[in-house]
Amino acid sequence: MPFITKISTQKKNTERFNIFLDDKYAFSVDADVLVKFELKKGKELDDLDIIEIQYGDEVKKGFNRALDFLSYRMRSTKEVEDHLKKKETSPPVIAEVIHRLNDYKYLNDQEFAAAYVSTHKKTNGKGPDVLFRELRAKGIDDDTIKEALSSFSFEDQTREAVKHVEKLLKKDKKLSTKELKQRAQLQLQRKGFSFDVISAAMDQIEYENDEDTEKEALRLHAEKAFRKYRYDGSYESAMKVKQFLFRKGFSLDLIEQLLQEEEY
């Protein structure tokens, strides 16, 4: 059986050590692995010893990678597993790393799910349906997700939905009242809010344009329609413009009024 004839510190990483067996480089280990297996000059190692030492070193590498990954933000168990897989860590090592992370309480899917809901419902205005799908994609089980979402009350959901629509109304001044309402409802659906929450939010919002704002929005769309259909005052071009503007949600009375104005 070979003997350890030399142990040297790596130049680029002083926490790792090169192990030489019978005067030939054999492998390297982390400082903690060196201490754990009591590696020192003159120690005899058989094949099983070497396999055990190298496995322990792979676990240490995986553990360090996981800690670095966790240092940026909280992660789910699946996120850590996926990260280690990308680093070509073997399944047995991943399982051991996850076990240790749980022992040290670096991983907790219940706490992760609760924090995820708390953060994303406020910063991104996401509704329960979207949060549910995202957490499931991160490997959180349905019961844990439901428990986390229980803190997102109907009142809180409605409040976040109202905030989202109010931002939309400030941004989209070029839309008709009808389009504003439709777009608001669609965006809330995409954000993951239920029909009941959307209805409650829409009831709280004043999305009706004042007359001047509605007319200004109509004029902007009319200019596009005039160019698109080459409006020349003829019946045919006027009908195409009217249909275009009506589909955009403007009233026929307002459209007729615009077309009758002298400049048109």
Curated annotation (Swiss-Prot):
NCBIfam families tied to this protein: PRK14135.1
Function recorded in the entry:
Negatively modulates RecA activity.
List, alphabetically, the GO terms of the cellular component aspect: cytoplasm
Keywords for this entry?
A: Cytoplasm
Name the InterPro entries for this protein: RecX_HTH_1st, RecX_HTH_2nd, RecX_HTH_3rd, Regulatory_RecX, WH-like_DNA-bd_sf
Native organism is Bacillus subtilis (strain 168)
Family, according to the entry, reads as follows: Belongs to the RecX family.
Q: What is the lineage of its organism?
A: Bacteria, Bacillati, Bacillota, Bacilli, Bacillales
Pfam families registered for this protein in UniProt = RecX_HTH1, RecX_HTH2, RecX_HTH3
Q: Name one GO biological process term.
A: regulation of DNA repair
* Summary of the knockout phenotype: A single recX deletion rapidly increases RecA expression after DNA damage.
Cellular localisation: Cytoplasm
Q: What is this protein called?
A: Regulatory protein RecX
